[in-house]
A protein has these predicted regions:
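Residues that define the transmembrane beta-barrel architecture of outer-membrane proteins
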Residues: 22-30, 67-71, 111-117, 143-147, ...
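Outer-membrane beta-barrel translocator domains and adjoining extracellular loop/strand segments
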Residues: 12-20, 56-66, 100-112, 134-135, ...
Length: 248
């Protein structure tokens, strides 16, 4: 699967960056997702993505600290129905260069790379409802834990159009450095709606989306006490955009 698109704001695990954080707002993401079947139950999954920030590329306007575009590499093993019927389990490794997490790593550790191991559990509750959680442990750059539980609903509106609605949150434990205000607690809450539309070309879809994002207590601690123009995160943000997806 190959995709490319546009989003009105840069987001990281539900956190919406302010204009001040990266000297800009919108992003242009592109990526490729691969799934190699080993057998009916097991697969090797891999992905690579690059997110271009249409911004000044400086962290909080500091000319000495660049805010790099985000590059993400992912490699994992996926099992379906092995532990429990309707349960998909993915265990893998993730490398992030740039973006919010990579740039925080550079700020504290003189480089822009964060690496982590992750475990995703996704359970199909019914034909339409699903729920899951992704747990990540970062071991290079920024270290600590991320937790991202979610619940969602998917259905066909007509033969060429589906709808997917997801609600979720992200939280950290001892991340960003134990002494940092944002180290622990909820970082973001969100509700996202997607409307995949099959186009006339075989395997080609357009996926418009909109999400409503609220900063969690961890992110709010960073904003607290700062002037409005200097807050790194949006207390509330609406992010809209679309992606063109080709499946093969």
């Amino acid at each position: 699967e190959v995709d490319a698109g546009y989003a009105s704001n840069y987001t990281c695990r539900g956190i919406v960056a302010s204009h001040a954080l990266a000297e800009g707002d919108s992003v242009i993401p592109a990526g490729v997702n691969l799934n190699y079947k080993l057998c009916d139950a097991n697969s090797i999954v891999a992905s690579a993505s690059y997110t271009t920030l249409t911004s000044g590329h400086h962290l909080m306007g500091d000319r000495d600290i660049s805010f790099h575009n985000e590059t993400n590499f992912n490699l994992g093993w996926q099992n379906k129905d092995g532990l429990l019927k309707n349960l998909s389990t993915t265990l893998g490794w993730n490398l992030i260069h740039g973006g919010l997490l990579g740039n925080f790593a550079k700020y504290d550790h003189a480089h822009s790379v964060t690496q982590e191991f992750y475990l995703n559990l996704n359970y199909d509750l019914t034909q339409n409802w699903f729920a899951g959680v992704t747990t990540s442990y970062a071991f290079q750059g920024m270290t600590g834990w991320w937790f991202q539980p979610y619940v969602g609903y998917k259905a066909a509106l007509c033969p060429v159009t589906d709808i997917v609605v997801t609600a979720g949150m992200s939280a950290t434990s001892s991340y960003f450095g134990a002494a940092f205000e944002q180290a622990n607690g909820a970082q973001a809450w969100w509700v996202k709606a997607e409307l995949p539309v099959k186009l006339g070309v075989k395997n080609l879809s357009l996926v418009p989306f909109v999400s409503f994002n609220w900063a969690g207590c961890g992110a709010l601690k960073v904003n607290k006490g700062l002037d409005k123009g200097d807050k790194p995160y949006k207390n509330f943000g609406v992010v809209a955009g679309a992606s063109l997806v080709y499946s093969f």
